[in-house]
């Protein structure tokens, strides 16, 4: 049936065609349509080493069908691209022949190292067909490394390409002790020299842990591995350092050669602005910053002296600083200023020259280093007048050479950095500030301004020790600088160097250079304590406190027994101090029970005053209640309190850096004066605050003046028969806590200043015995104190100017000048004598010297203990602090000053021999003392 239908359809088509042809027979024959061929483009695929992808043809403006991803060993296909890093978009019409390239990501494989008990080695990622770098040879105690093995145990070839993840296993062989030592030795040798100033000297082998004992064989090399550059005049040389390696019972000695060289020039590359805060009330100095310079990787700071002086304006008199001239020329800094002395009507031209070419600091007049210093806030010089050079008997002798500090001898370098002159900070501080007791302390993080050496536990001390360097080691450059600085300071600022026959302190330092050159802070501090207490061994030189590099809580060199001292200081305790204490205890029961004064006879014509130290307080004296003194101390223009009645007034400045306060002791006021002064205060607007709790006999007064709540305490002290007024610029938080000013403190104020103490003691003695004619000043238990306090005490003994003789050790200058004490009460024509012992030291020794030199009266007792020098504080670069005998020495002048009988100046370090000897058992025996005084021929 289907075939029939198909044939019928074909027949029908033929019929229709025929009819059409007949109907159109009269029209032109039609032209055929032109055949249009479609334009095509070829897309070629370059797999760049991958599996082949055949090219394809694509019609113009058509889109390419993305082929299947090619494959390539060790790679992952990423995409096709025409241009690097830009993936081809297969939705883009094709308009030309193109070649698409395959982008591949190389496979990564991990190579893992199994060290089999050796050090852990991090896995390494390697690209396909890459090679893995052989790691450093691992080490394992007791074993020697053989090779890295594949899984089959054979040695891996590190030139082999990596085509899969891989684990390599260390193959070890057991070593003999000798072999272990050899490997340790080779490892030490490879890293032995770190720098010109540092060697790597481990105490255990870095591979097998062999015990290593070093013998440096040179004072220039420490057990810490610090190498000291050779001092000037020493030829370069090679020294052999030996190390004994021990493994079990096996010992092997090896030698290491070390080149000792001269110091290399300091190259300063890094600067840092360091914050500065002044923490002493003695000088008013603003906070600031100071640029410090360092070598690359170094910790020793360098500073421009001009910047340093400008930083501490306030210690440096602003008027002096304004006229100082700083001249920089050809590697030389010259600092100049004129200094006018009104008493002499003379101007001194003061100059110092800092020469980086010759490495010297030259000062013709050493006064350069102190003449610019501002007066301290504390009134240490009250009632002291210095006679000028025209006073009869005045003398001064000095070499014309001045001072030359040759820093080259100590490898302390002056650096010329692009015309700026820089010196080690510790040296600048000591020269330009420390010699006047002001110090700028650098602790690695900040700068702190302090006076002398603050007490441990004080705010100043805590600020000094607050540093990020706590518990760390010294750097080698700091160790070297510290060693040389210590030698320089001791050679130039220790006043008794010549007295004790010390040519240079390098001799002492080199005896124990290994510990002085240690990088361990505790070791250095122990060595310094030994040097000061055992080698130098004199009372004015002692350890202060440890470096800020030490761990918190470390107190440094602590004296716990008499053998911690050398024979001189130990002998002073055993032969002087303790026997005198025994004699005092035998007489009065204890040293604390010793009276302020006592009489030698029943008639009380001969008395003894006890003076165990020379103390001073910051105070002002007046015969009237001077409110300007109150205003000055309280830093105000306001009149704070009404004037009080009395015959003499002592104004004590007892404030601190945060608070102002003044305490006034008034002689000549009646016991009933409290009610009178209370009425004056209340009339002035003060409110009286009193709680009848029985804890305090009186309350306090308060008033707000200028926004400040002032506190005033007033009371009469019956023991000393004085009236007390205390003024503070703040109130106590509660009534029951400690008050800032306290009427019960009268005894402490009076006894805290030797001149005030002596005045009140004489008041009591003369009141008790109007027949008093002879006074013996007992300084047998006096170990020194403030020189100004000593001078004021002498003012009670003589109203005439008295002579003091000084010797300056570093310059060789010698002088005798005269001092007069004013505003001293008149107690009539008393005859004075002095009682001394071996305990009478320092200022006590100076009192005996002044007595002797000025013929103030007979000296009784035992030869004094010496102590010719004043004390100077020293801060080392590493922060360790100590005090020592300075260049300023007390002495005696003999001779008449003529050509035939010239003046001879002798320091009194050996002490003063008394005119009349007393054994220690007779020091406090009334009959023995009285017999001497009665037998003495008085002028």
Predicted feature residues:
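Beta-rich interaction/scaffold domains
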Residues: 26, 104-106, 167, 171-266, ...
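Extracytoplasmic Gram-positive cell-surface binding/anchoring modules and repeats
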Residues: 58-71, 126-139, 288-326, 411-427, ...
């Amino acid at each position: 049936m289907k075939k029939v239908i198909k044939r019928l359809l074909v027949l029908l088509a033929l019929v229709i065609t025929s009819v059409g042809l007949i109907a159109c027979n009269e029209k032109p024959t039609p032209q055929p349509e032109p055949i249009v061929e479609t334009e095509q483009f070829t897309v070629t695929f370059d797999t760049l080493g991958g599996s082949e992808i055949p090219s394809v043809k694509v019609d113009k403006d058509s889109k390419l069908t993305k082929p299947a991803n090619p494959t390539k060993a060790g790679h992952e296909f990423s995409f096709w691209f025409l241009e690097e890093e830009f993936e081809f978009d297969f939705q883009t019409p094709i308009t030309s022949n193109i070649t698409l390239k395959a982008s591949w990501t190389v496979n990564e494989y991990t190579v893992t190292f199994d060290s089999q008990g050796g050090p852990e080695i991090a896995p390494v990622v390697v690209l396909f067909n890459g090679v893995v770098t052989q790691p450093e040879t691992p080490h394992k105690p007791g074993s020697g490394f053989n090779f890295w093995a594949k899984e089959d145990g054979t040695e891996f070839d590190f030139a082999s390409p990596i085509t899969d993840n891989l684990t390599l296993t260390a193959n070890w062989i057991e070593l003999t002790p000798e072999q272990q030592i050899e490997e340790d030795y080779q490892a030490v040798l490879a890293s032995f020299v770190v720098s010109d100033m540092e060697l790597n000297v481990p105490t255990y082998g870095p591979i097998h842990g062999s015990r290593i004992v070093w013998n440096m064989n040179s004072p220039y090399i420490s057990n810490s591995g610090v190498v000291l550059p050779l001092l000037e005049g020493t030829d370069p040389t090679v020294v052999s350092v030996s190390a004994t390696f021990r493994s079990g019972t096996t010992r092997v000695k090896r030698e290491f050669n070390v080149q000792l060289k001269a110091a290399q020039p300091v190259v300063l590359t890094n600067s840092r602005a360091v914050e500065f805060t002044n923490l002493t009330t003695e000088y008013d100095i603003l906070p600031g910053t100071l640029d410090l310079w360092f070598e690359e990787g170094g910790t020793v700071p360098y500073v421009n002296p001009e910047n340093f002086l400008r930083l501490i304006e306030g210690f440096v008199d602003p008027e002096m600083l304004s006229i100082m001239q700083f001249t920089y020329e050809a590697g030389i800094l010259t600092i100049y200023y004129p200094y006018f002395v009104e008493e002499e009507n003379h101007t001194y031209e003061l100059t110092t020259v800092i020469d980086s070419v010759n490495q010297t600091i030259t000062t013709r007049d050493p006064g350069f280093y102190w003449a610019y210093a501002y007066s301290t806030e504390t009134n240490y010089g009250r009632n002291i007048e210095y006679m000028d050079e025209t006073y009869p008997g005045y003398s001064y002798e000095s070499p014309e050479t001045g001072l030359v500090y040759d820093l080259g001898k100590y490898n302390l370098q002056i650096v010329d950095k692009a015309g700026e002159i820089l010196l080690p900070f510790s040296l600048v501080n000591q020269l330009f500030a420390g010699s006047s007791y002001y110090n700028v302390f650098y602790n690695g993080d900040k700068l702190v301004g302090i006076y002398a050496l603050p007490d441990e536990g004080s705010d100043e001390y805590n600020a000094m020790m607050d540093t990020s360097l706590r518990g760390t080691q010294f750097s080698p450059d700091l160790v070297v600088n510290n060693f040389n600085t210590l030698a320089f300071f001791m050679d130039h600022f220790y006043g008794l160097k010549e007295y004790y026959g010390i040519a240079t302190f390098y001799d002492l330092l080199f005896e124990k250079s290994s510990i002085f050159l240690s990088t361990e802070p505790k070791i250095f501090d122990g060595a310094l304590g030994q040097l000061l207490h055992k080698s130098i061994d004199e009372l004015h030189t002692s350890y202060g406190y440890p470096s800020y590099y030490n761990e918190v809580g470390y107190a440094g060199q602590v004296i716990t027994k008499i053998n911690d001292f050398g024979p001189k200081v130990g002998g002073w305790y055993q032969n002087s101090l303790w026997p005198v204490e025994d004699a005092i205890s035998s007489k009065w029961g204890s040293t604390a029970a010793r009276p302020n004064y006592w009489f030698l006879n029943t008639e009380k014509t001969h008395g003894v005053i006890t003076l165990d130290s020379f103390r001073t307080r910051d105070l002002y004296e007046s015969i009237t209640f001077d409110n300007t003194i109150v205003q000055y101390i309280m830093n105000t223009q306001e009149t704070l309190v009404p004037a009080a009645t009395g015959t003499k007034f002592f104004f004590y400045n007892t404030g601190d850096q945060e608070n102002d306060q003044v305490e006034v002791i008034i002689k000549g006021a009646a016991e009933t004066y409290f009610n009178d002064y209370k009425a004056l205060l209340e009339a002035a607007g003060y409110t009286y605050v009193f709680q009848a709790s029985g804890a305090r006999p009186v309350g306090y007064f308060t008033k707000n003046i200028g926004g400040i709540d002032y506190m005033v305490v007033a009371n009469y002290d019956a023991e000393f028969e004085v009236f007390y007024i205390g003024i503070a610029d703040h109130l106590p938080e509660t009534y029951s806590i400690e008050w800032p000013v306290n009427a019960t403190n009268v005894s402490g104020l009076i006894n805290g200043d030797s001149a005030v103490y002596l005045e009140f003691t004489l008041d009591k003695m003369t009141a008790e015995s109007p027949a008093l004619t002879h006074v013996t000043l007992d300084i047998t238990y006096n170990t020194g104190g403030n020189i100004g306090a000593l001078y004021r005490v002498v003012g009670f003994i003589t109203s005439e100017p008295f002579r003091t003789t000084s010797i300056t050790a570093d310059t060789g200058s010698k002088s005798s000048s005269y001092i007069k004490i004013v505003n001293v009460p008149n107690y009539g024509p008393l005859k004075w004598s002095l009682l001394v012992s071996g305990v009478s030291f320092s200022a006590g020794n100076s009192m005996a010297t002044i007595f002797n030199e000025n013929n103030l009266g007979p000296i009784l007792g035992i030869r004094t203990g010496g102590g010719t020098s004043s004390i100077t504080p020293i801060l080392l670069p590493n922060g360790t602090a100590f005090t020592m005998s300075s260049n300023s020495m007390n002495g005696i002048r003999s001779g008449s000053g003529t050509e035939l009988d010239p003046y001879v100046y002798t320091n009194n370090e050996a002490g003063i021999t008394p005119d009349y000897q007393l054994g220690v058992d007779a020091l406090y025996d009334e009959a023995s003392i009285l017999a001497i005084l009665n037998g003495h021929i008085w002028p």
